């Protein structure tokens, strides 16, 4: 539902640090932004280190006049991925641009990240194929750590980096539950959840996605973690058609994270998660083993779960368990359910 506008940040916005005698202090609002970023970096940094987390959201429009989401990524270097939320039409465009310039000017100092490692994007509401469009061809990937795993991210070529930070608790949950399990990852994207399942001891895994690009990315992630051993299958297919074609296949742990909307030309029909989730859940739940667990997540903010769709299943809302400290300000960034067969007792 978003469109990326990508452009080079004007070098003039990042001036060399002046001497104490010549220093021009930023406007009051920008100073407030600096203070908030430094405070968040101190508090969230301690939290992240305790949890073995190297990539996290440090700021999410905490100050309404600076409507940015700022994510820190740490690998062999440190990077910042900065997204501006598109201002509503009621906001004066000139003033919004001034605030953006103020924010861009103070980010290197406040984050302690080099200017050339700050990547800036603008998010706009967008439906359809535009949200999957490729925006650059740099092909530059960086390895970051998450728990015991390593994952590749790309800051320039796509709308997102290849790692949904808000899903971190879900990936950790999958890793803890995966030992000895047959794991199925539907709409698998870059395979980050599959990496966690593999490192957690999954017996086998199957990751299904329509995109060859993302499956190649997933393959590289598996190789990076020593998991390219034949037990982890990558399938390029329309997930919905693929699920319906399965006969007799059973999985002990399934992660289902469909898009909000898709009209990809590779899909037989357009997909709308609100309209189609009931049929999708019925089909996917049929692949569960007797004691299997289905984790269903989506990021449609107005989503309403049809709890009557699976009468033989127990459906538990576990959203609160899957929102980490760095996303508490945006607690509806996704919703998540745990689905298992009802006990006959």
Question: Where would I find each of the regions flagged by the language model?
Answer:
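Conserved class I S-adenosyl-L-methionine
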Residues: 180-189
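Conserved SAM-binding loop of SAM-dependent methyltransferases across substrates and taxa
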Residues: 190-202
């Amino acid at each position: 539902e978003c469109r990326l506008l990508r452009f080079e940040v004007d070098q003039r916005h990042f001036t060399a640090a002046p001497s104490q005698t010549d220093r021009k202090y930023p406007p009051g609002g920008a100073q407030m932004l600096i203070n908030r970023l430094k405070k968040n970096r101190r508090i969230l940094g301690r939290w992240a280190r305790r949890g073995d987390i190297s990539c996290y959201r440090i700021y999410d429009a905490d100050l309404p006049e600076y409507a940015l989401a700022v994510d820190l990524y740490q690998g062999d270097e440190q990077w910042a991925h900065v997204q501006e939320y598109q201002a509503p039409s009621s906001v004066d465009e000139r003033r919004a641009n001034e605030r953006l310039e103020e924010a861009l000017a103070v980010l290197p100092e406040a984050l302690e990240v080099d200017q050339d490692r700050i990547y800036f994007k603008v998010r706009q509401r967008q439906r359809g194929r535009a949200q999957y469009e490729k925006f650059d061809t740099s092909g530059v990937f960086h390895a970051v750590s998450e728990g015991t795993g390593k994952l590749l991210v790309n800051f320039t070529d796509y709308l997102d980096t290849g790692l949904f930070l808000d899903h971190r608790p879900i990936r950790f949950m999958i890793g803890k539950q995966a030992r000895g399990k047959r794991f199925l990852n539907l709409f698998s994207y870059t395979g980050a959840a599959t990496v966690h399942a593999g490192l957690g001891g999954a017996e086998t895994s199957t990751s299904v996605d329509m995109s060859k690009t993302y499956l190649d990315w997933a393959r590289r992630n598996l190789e990076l973690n020593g998991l390219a051993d034949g037990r982890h299958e990558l399938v390029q297919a329309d997930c919905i058609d693929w699920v319906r074609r399965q006969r007799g296949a059973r999985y002990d742990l399934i992660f289902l994270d469909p898009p909000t909307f898709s009209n990809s030309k590779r899909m037989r029909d357009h997909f709308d998660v609100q309209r189609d989730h009931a049929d999708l859940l019925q089909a996917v739940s049929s692949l569960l083993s007797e004691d299997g667990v289905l984790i269903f997540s989506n990021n449609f903010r107005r989503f309403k779960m049809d709890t009557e769709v699976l009468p033989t299943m127990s459906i538990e809302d576990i959203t609160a368990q899957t929102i980490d400290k760095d996303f508490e300000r945006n607690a509806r960034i996704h919703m998540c359910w745990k689905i298992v067969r009802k006990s006959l007792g």
